[in-house]
């Protein structure tokens, strides 16, 4: 029985090692900005535009088979802005995507992605308390969103890459702002683990 257990463990480890051989993991940090249509006035109410400002972003992906994989990302406004000129707020965007990363040449890889996520608009100055989570100094307005994007990885040194990127966020029921469509564009610096 002991020999059978050892044989099964050795076989399982060899399967895991061979399947992990073809995988690639990438992580990146970048900065960008967002744009959207200009603010509007409806029924005497002003709806500002969800645009401008610096948006740091963290992203990570794993390529599993034939350059297809999964990607996750979070980006947020680096500093608070004023909503309607008086209320401090900060939008946070997060998404989970299917990713296709075809290799274009030795040093260039394209990225095409699509997925789902959300926008969390945090309005500051309001204290909210909960028995389970404690107290926070903001109130959140959350919205479901679709995410479509593209990027171009340019490997500049070994597995280090720079990536210009663009994202289209289609935000459901984005009542606080003038548009349901937001475009984020920027650049990232990243590293590929497990080859490229």
Where are the regions that the model predicts?
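Transmembrane beta-strand segments of Gram-negative outer membrane beta-barrel proteins
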Residues: 22-37, 112
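Surface-exposed strand-loop-strand hairpins of Gram-negative outer-membrane beta-barrel proteins
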Residues: 34-56, 141-142
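Gram-negative and organellar
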Residues: 31, 129, 133-135, 146
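Extracellular loop and loop/strand-boundary signature of outer-membrane beta-barrel proteins
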Residues: 42-47, 81-87, 132-138, 172-177
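Short, well-ordered secondary-structure micro-motifs
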Residues: 39-40, 122-127, 175-176
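Cleavable N-terminal export/targeting peptides
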Residues: 1-24, 194-196
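Polyanion-binding surface elements
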Residues: 151
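Gram-negative (and chloroplast) outer-membrane scaffold detector with strong preference
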Residues: 26, 56-131, 143-144, 154-158, ...
């Amino acid at each position: 029985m002991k020999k059978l257990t050892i044989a099964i463990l050795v076989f399982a480890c060899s399967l895991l090692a061979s399947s992990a051989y073809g995988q690639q993991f990438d992580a990146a940090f970048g900065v960008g900005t967002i744009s959207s249509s200009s603010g509007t006035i409806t029924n005497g109410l002003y709806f500002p535009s969800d645009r401008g400002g610096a948006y740091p972003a963290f992203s990570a992906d794993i390529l599993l088979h034939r350059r297809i994989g999964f990607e996750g990302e979070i980006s947020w406004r680096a500093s608070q802005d004023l909503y309607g000129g008086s209320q401090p707020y900060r939008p946070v965007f997060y998404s989970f995507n299917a990713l296709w990363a075809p290799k274009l040449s030795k040093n260039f890889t394209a990225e095409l992605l699509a997925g789902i996520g959300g926008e969390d608009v945090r309005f500051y100055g309001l204290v909210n308390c909960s028995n389970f989570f404690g107290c926070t100094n903001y109130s959140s307005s959350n919205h479901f969103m679709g995410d479509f994007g593209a990027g171009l990885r340019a490997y500049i040194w070994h597995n280090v890459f720079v990536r210009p990127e663009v994202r289209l966020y289609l935000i459901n029921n984005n009542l606080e702002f003038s548009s349901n469509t937001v475009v984020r564009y920027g650049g990232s610096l990243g590293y590929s683990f497990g080859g490229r």
